[in-house]
């Protein structure tokens, strides 16, 4: 989603592959997969992002997500 990242493509792709493997292992349909991933995002925002930063971080994440799925 990010244009520039402090993480390598290898790091990001490895985590994505593991997350997708878990979803495949459970044969999770798309709606369940999105629900589970969304709950993970919520958990991270609530537990890893300071309360005073959550609104901005959430808005930035939502904007990046929206931009990553746009079809021109």
From Swiss-Prot:
It comes from the Bacteria. InterPro entries: UPF0352 (IPR009857), YejL_sf (IPR023202). Gene3D superfamilies: YejL-like. It holds the Pfam family DUF1414. HAMAP family: UPF0352. Belongs to the UPF0352 family. This is UPF0352 protein Shal_2512. It comes from Shewanella halifaxensis (strain HAW-EB4).
């Amino acid at each position: 989603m990010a244009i520039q990242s402090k993480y390598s493509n290898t790091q990001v792709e490895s985590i994505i592959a593991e997350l997708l493997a878990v979803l495949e292992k459970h044969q999770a349909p798309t709606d369940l997969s999105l629900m589970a991933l969304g709950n993970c995002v919520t958990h991270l925002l609530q537990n890893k992002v300071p309360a005073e930063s959550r609104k901005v971080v959430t808005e930035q994440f939502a904007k990046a997500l929206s931009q990553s799925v746009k079809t021109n």
